[in-house]
Each structure stands twice: as structure tokens, then as C-alpha cells.
């Protein structure tokens, strides 16, 4: 439920105090947002969402307090409205009734309800200790007010020709108050004094109550507006002027004074500059709060540690501080040394790879050759051999390695003191032209492009017809639109028209079929298209893969290798040797990918192979069963040209024969790689 403007004005001071208590400082933006939430009748959830950007974690607590204050304000206004209805009293409730006084003269005096008793009963308005309130009247001020009221009464009596003593009369008792007033225009002096004393007593109580209210309002500025001015006006209307009360701790705002030019001036007329409050960001607010918190920590008095029995003056207390980070400059040449070290390491690895590759090419891989190369005599520790074992394989036998001049025939041919730097050639496979991906249209774009093309072709035909270059096409007549196209002709001779329409339909169907037949490929064209799709362009380089199979005696597996190589248009060779069956294939990357999946995944090499040698070789069969058959990829890469033709099988009983077959095609290193892996596997 939304609140009125008056209720929002009453609620605004409380919201300002709550914001200051929650945030630690006043923020007009939050106050305005809270007033908007209450004024629009939002519930707690919506108000919390609206105020969360301003208050963060304190939002729920602030919203609960806000709605509690709104409910208290509604209940207080409701009770106040009920009390206002009962507050309308007649004059007899204040001054008493003559008939009632005469009837109850013998009894106890009737209690008269003061005007401000209801206000005095409210615990929220009257503060606890009256002496502490800055706006409460002192005893001296009340005495001055009483003397002023007495003087006014005396002057009034003189005007009414009543004689009364100058001193103020004391309070009359209950017996004197119960006297009946005479009926007539004349009033007795005693009765007039009684009335005046009652009026003075009521005025004194009203002044005390008004002073308390003023003190309470001074603590809460702007809560009820100018309520104190209303009370002062009532006192002046009664003829009693209360003395001025100086409030030292008054928190009312300074009145705004403007000169003729609209500038802000003080009481002396001097121009002053007002502080302009501008909205700020949340980050700035947090920064201010952080600085205030640090200042409070600095100003916090330190504890008296000297009184502690465990305090040692010799130990210095140094707070934990973060060390400042300084610049650390690298020495000159540091990264050059690191790069040189990495280059040296890479060259060493490359040299080791070249040495191992040369050893494989020369055939230094079997255990027998290694045994021949190793020195026969054992050298003692610290003894230097005449020749190293790796040089003994190269240097011819009978060479005198002792001191002396060597003859010209012992000199090596082609060895000089010059270093040959071969010309650098570009790699045959890598192309300098960048690879660009084609742009593929979506289905929607393809349809749009097709519509545009057909529309342009149709426009071109229409232009030719319009210019007379070609006759206009016949109307496309169907059975469904027969009557609409031909009209009266169809009505006159329907049979003739139907035959004409069917002839046109057959003509269109025939033209369509002829166009399809013209576009259809012949058997040779389809075959060439399929071959072109399977054959790949190897002008930039041929992809080569070398496989090693332990046992390739099964004819079914041989047929699979040969058939798939022919279907994928791969070239190569299969060399059959005991425990070393080498398969070399050459072709494009797509075909190599399919053949690799065939060799490593599709063919089950560990299946039981057929015994082609008969029943005589029982021992060899047992050994083959113990060794599980498998296929491994030895090497794959690229070369400039093909080395082999159509896929063929070659039976080689010895290693030299197999190597010679590869050497004839310039690919003996394939055999060396496969054989070295087989030797290493057998030694393991």
C-alpha cells in the first residue's frame, strides 16, 4: 500500500538516520530510493532488489527496519485518529459544570482531565529524565511565567472593578471549589480568583508539556514540521508568553538568506559558498570508508603494555610489512648464452641421429657384426688404445699406425683440407602458395542464388520476346487450368481442346527426358569420374608408409593387402622373409589413411595361420604359435617420386637378397629400418 506525501515527509528523517547508521555516512541517493520504494507500495522482496546496488550486504537488514517503521507509523496514526475523535470535549469538561458542582459538594472533588493529558501518557514523546532535555523549562523560567500570568490577572481584575490583594493567592481547597456560583451577571471575587488560578495551573502544565515536546523535537529535526511553532501560538493566544530558551546543542539547519542578486549570504551580509553534494560511485564510497577505517586504527590508543608482566622492552615490535618489489635486470648476454647452449644441444642430437642412421645403412645392427667390431683384447684402466673400435671398421688392415711419414698410396682419395658446403635446395613437397579454403554456401543461400539465376534468365527471355528476336512461348496449358486459359474455345469443342492439351503435356515430358538423357554420363565417363575421385594428386609429393609383419603366410591376408592396394590405386612392394615381412605402399594421403586402418585395425593378425609346409615342421609351428603375429608401422613420410610400380610380392630367403631388391629401387633404407627393429625386438 502506497503512502501519502505527508507520511513520506514524516518518515524521511528516520530513513536518513538509518542510512547513516548502516553505511557510516549520509547518502541522499539511498534515502530517495527508499522513499520511492515505500511510496510506490513495493513489498520487501522488490524493495530489497531495488536497494541492493546501494547497500550490498546490509540490504535485508535495512529493508526490515524500513518496513517496521512504516507499520509503526500506520499504527500510531490509527490510534491518534481514534484519540482525536474522543478529544472533542465541551467547555464543561475543562472548567466544570455548576449543577455537578452543587450536587457533589459534600463528596470528593471530581477529577478534571487536563487538555494535554493524552499527550503526557504517551511514552514515546516524553523523555525519561526531564532535566537532561535541552528544550525543557527550568524552575526559574516557570516562576517568571507564573508572575507574568499573575500580573495579567490583577490588571484584568482592576478592569472589572474587583479588589484583590497584590500577592498571588494560594491554591484553593476542594471545599472552596464546591461552592455554587450565583446565577446572574455579577461574579464574586472569590469565584473569579478560583477561575483564574485554574487557568494559571492549566497554562503552567501546558508550558511544561510544550517544553518537553520542543526538547524531543530538537533531537529529531524535521520529524513533525513546525509543531513547536503551533504550541507557542497557543500560549500567545492564552496571553502567556514563555521566555526564550537557548539551545546550545540545537541541530536545526541554518536559515537560508538571499540578497537582491540571489546570492547566499550570512547574517552580516557577507557572501558565502555552500557545499554542493553530488552523487558518487560505490567505489569512491568504499575508498572513503577504507580511509576512515585506517584513520580510526591510527588514532586508536595503544594498550598499556608496560603494565603487563610478560612485556619485554628489549624486544622491538615491527609490524609485518610487504617488501617493495624492485626491478631485476638481466645481465648482458644471458639469453644469448642460453640460446647457444640450446643450439649446441640440438646439434648434438642431430649428430647422434646421423651416426645411428649411418650405422643402420652400413648394417651394423646384428650381434655377429657387433662382436667382430669389438676389440678382442681387454684394455686396462687408463691405457690408451692404438685405434678406437669404431675406426677399426673403416681403416684398412695392415696400416702402420706408428710414427713416420706415410706413402702417397696410403693417402685417402678425395680427402682434402677444404670444407664442402652443398647448395641449399627448396623442399620438393612444400609449396609457397598459401592454402585457401573454399567458401561454401548454406542451403538458404543456395536457394536464393538459384532463384536469382532463374529470374535473370527469365528476364533475358522476356527482353528477347519484347524486341522480337524470338516468338513468344505458347501458354502452358494443363488439365487443371484448361477452362481458365482457353475460355470459349474449350466450351465450343472440349474434345479437341483436351487432345491439344494432352499433346502439349507429352511434348513437355519428352523434352524433359531428353534433357536428362543429354546430361547423363556414359559408362566410360562414370568410370573415369570414379577413378579421378580415387586417384589423388601426387605432383607435390608422394606419401609413403612402411609396415612390418611377423608372419604373412596366410593367403587370405595377402589377398586383402593386394586387393585394397589395387582399389585405392596404391603402388609398392611386399617382401617376404622369415619374421621380417616388409610392406611398402605409396600414394595419396586419403588412400594412405584407409590402408593404415586396414593394416593396423581391420586385419586380425593374431588369428591362427594355415600350415603350408606340412606336418614335418612341428617344431617351427610350435615356435610360431609362441610368437603372436602382429603388424607395426615402421615409418611414414613423403618423397618426391614413386619408387615402385604396381603392388607385387617378392620372396627373399636371405637378408642380402631382400636388401638388394630394395637397393635396386633406391629404397634400401626401408629394409634397414625394418630389420633393425626386428633385431631389437628379438633381443628384448
UniProtKB/Swiss-Prot annotation:
Region called Disordered, residue ranges: 73-109, 162-183
Location within or outside the cell: Nucleus; Nucleus speckle
Protein's name according to its UniProt entry: U4/U6 small nuclear ribonucleoprotein Prp3
One GO-annotated biological process of the protein: mRNA splicing, via spliceosome
GO cellular component, as recorded: nuclear speck; nucleus; spliceosomal complex; U4/U6 x U5 tri-snRNP complex
Record text on subunit structure and interactions: Component of the precatalytic spliceosome (spliceosome B complex). Component of the U4/U6-U5 tri-snRNP complex, a building block of the precatalytic spliceosome (spliceosome B complex). The U4/U6-U5 tri-snRNP complex is composed of the U4, U6 and U5 snRNAs and at least PRPF3, PRPF4, PRPF6, PRPF8, PRPF31, SNRNP200, TXNL4A, SNRNP40, SNRPB, SNRPD1, SNRPD2, SNRPD3, SNRPE, SNRPF, SNRPG, DDX23, CD2BP2, PPIH, SNU13, EFTUD2, SART1 and USP39, plus LSM2, LSM3, LSM4, LSM5, LSM6, LSM7 and LSM8.
Compositional bias annotation for Polar residues: 170-183
Record function comment: Plays a role in pre-mRNA splicing as component of the U4/U6-U5 tri-snRNP complex that is involved in spliceosome assembly, and as component of the precatalytic spliceosome (spliceosome B complex).
Entry keywords, A to Z: mRNA processing, mRNA splicing, Nucleus, Phosphoprotein, Spliceosome
Biased composition (Basic and acidic residues): 73-107
Gene: PRPF3
Domain PWI: 1-87
Listed Pfam families: PRP3, Prp3_C, PWI
SUPFAM superfamilies: PWI domain
Amino acid at each position: 500500500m502506497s503512502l501519502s506525501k505527508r507520511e513520506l515527509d514524516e518518515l524521511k528523517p528516520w530513513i536518513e538516520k538509518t542510512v547513516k547508521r548502516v553505511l557510516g555516512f549520509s547518502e541522499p541517493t539511498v534515502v530517495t530510493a527508499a522513499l520511492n520504494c515505500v511510496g510506490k507500495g513495493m513489498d520487501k522482496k522488490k524493495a530489497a532488489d531495488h536497494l541492493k546496488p546501494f547497500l550490498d550486504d546490509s540490504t535485508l537488514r535495512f529493508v526490515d527496519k524500513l518496513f517496521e517503521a512504516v507499520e509503526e507509523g500506520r499504527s500510531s496514526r490509527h490510534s491518534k485518529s481514534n484519540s482525536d475523535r474522543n478529544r472533542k470535549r465541551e467547555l464543561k469538561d475543562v472548567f466544570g459544570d455548576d449543577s455537578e458542582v452543587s450536587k457533589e459538594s459534600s463528596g470528593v472533588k471530581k477529577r478534571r482531565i487536563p487538555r494535554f493529558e493524552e499527550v503526557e501518557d504517551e511514552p514515546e514523546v516524553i523523555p525519561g529524565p526531564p532535566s537532561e532535555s535541552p528544550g525543557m523549562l527550568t524552575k526559574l523560567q516557570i516562576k517568571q511565567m507564573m508572575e507574568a500570568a499573575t500580573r495579567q490577572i490583577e490588571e484584568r481584575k482592576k478592569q472589572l472593578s474587583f479588589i484583590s490583594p497584590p500577592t498571588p493567592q494560594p491554591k484553593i481547597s476542594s471545599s472552596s471549589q464546591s461552592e455554587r456560583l450565583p446565577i446572574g451577571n455579577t461574579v464574586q471575587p472569590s469565584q473569579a480568583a478560583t477561575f483564574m488560578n485554574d487557568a494559571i495551573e492549566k497554562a503552567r502544565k501546558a508550558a511544561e508539556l510544550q517544553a518537553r515536546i520542543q526538547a524531543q523535537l530538537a533531537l529529531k529535526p524535521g520529524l513533525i514540521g513546525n509543531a513547536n511553532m503551533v504550541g507557542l501560538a497557543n500560549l500567545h493566544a492564552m496571553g502567556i508568553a514563555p521566555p526564550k530558551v537557548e539551545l546550545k546543542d540545537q541541530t536545526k539547519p541554518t536559515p537560508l538568506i538571499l540578497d537582491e542578486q540571489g546570492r547566499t549570504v550570512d547574517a552580516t551580509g557577507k557572501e558565502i559558498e555552500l557545499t554542493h553534494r553530488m552523487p558518487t560511485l560505490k567505489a569512491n564510497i568504499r575508498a572513503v570508508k577504507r580511509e576512515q577505517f585506517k584513520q580510526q586504527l591510527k588514532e586508536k590508543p595503544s594498550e598499556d603494555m608496560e603494565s603487563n608482566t610478560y612485556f619485554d622492552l628489549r624486544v622491538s615490535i615491527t609490524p609485518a610489512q610487504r617488501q617493495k618489489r624492485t626491478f631485476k635486470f638481466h645481465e648482458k648476454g644471458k639469453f644469448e648464452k642460453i640460446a647457444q647452449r640450446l643450439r649446441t644441444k640440438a646439434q648434438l642430437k642431430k649428430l647422434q641421429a646421423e651416426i645411428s642412421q649411418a650405422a643402420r645403412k652400413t648394417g651394423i645392427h646384428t650381434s655377429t657384426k657387433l662382436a667382430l667390431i669389438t676389440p678382442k683384447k681387454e684394455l686396462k684402466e687408463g691405457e690408451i688404445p692404438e685405434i678406437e673400435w669404431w675406426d677399426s671398421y673403416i681403416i684398412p688392415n695392415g696400416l702402420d699406425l706408428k710414427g713416420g711419414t706415410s706413402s702417397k698410396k696410403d693417402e685417402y682419395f678425395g680427402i682434402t683440407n677444404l670444407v664442402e658446403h652443398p647448395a641449399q635446395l627448396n623442399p620438393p613437397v612444400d609449396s609457397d602458395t598459401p592454402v585457401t579454403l573454399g567458401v561454401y554456401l548454406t542451403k538458404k543461400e543456395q536457394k536464393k542464388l538459384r532463384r536469382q539465376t532463374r529470374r535473370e534468365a527469365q528476364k533475358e527471355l522476356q527482353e528477347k520476346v519484347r524486341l522480337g528476336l524470338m516468338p513468344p512461348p505458347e501458354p502452358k496449358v494443363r488439365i487443371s487450368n484448361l477452362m481458365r486459359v482457353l475460355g470459349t474455345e474449350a466450351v465450343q469443342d472440349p474434345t479437341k481442346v483436351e487432345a491439344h492439351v494432352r499433346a502439349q503435356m507429352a511434348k513437355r515430358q519428352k523434352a524433359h527426358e531428353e534433357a536428362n538423357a543429354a546430361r547423363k554420363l556414359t559408362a566410360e565417363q562414370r568410370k573415369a569420374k570414379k577413378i579421378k575421385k580415387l586417384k589423388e594428386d601426387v605432383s607435390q609429393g608422394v606419401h609413403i608408409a612402411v609396415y612390418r609383419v611377423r608372419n604373412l603366410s596366410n593367403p587370405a591376408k595377402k589377398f586383402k593387402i593386394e586387393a585394397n592396394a589395387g582399389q585405392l590405386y596404391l603402388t609398392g612392394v611386399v617382401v617376404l622373409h622369415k619374421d621380417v615381412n616388409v610392406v611398402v605402399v605409396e600414394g595419396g594421403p586419403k588412400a594412405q589413411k584407409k590402408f593404415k586402418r586396414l593394416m593396423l585395425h581391420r586385419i586380425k593378425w593374431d588369428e591362427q595361420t594355415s600350415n603350408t609346409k606340412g606336418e614335418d615342421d612341428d617344431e617351427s609351428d610350435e615356435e610360431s604359435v609362441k610368437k603372436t603375429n602382429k603388424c607395426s608401422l615402421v615409418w611414414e613420410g613423403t618423397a618426391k617420386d614413386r619408387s615402385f610400380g604396381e603392388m607385387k610380392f617378392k620372396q627373399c630367403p636371405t637378408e642380402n637378397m631382400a636388401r638388394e631388391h630394395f637397393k635396386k629401387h633406391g629404397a634400401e633404407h626401408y629394409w634397414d629400418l625394418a630389420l633393425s627393429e626386428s633385431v631389437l625386438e628379438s633381443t628384448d
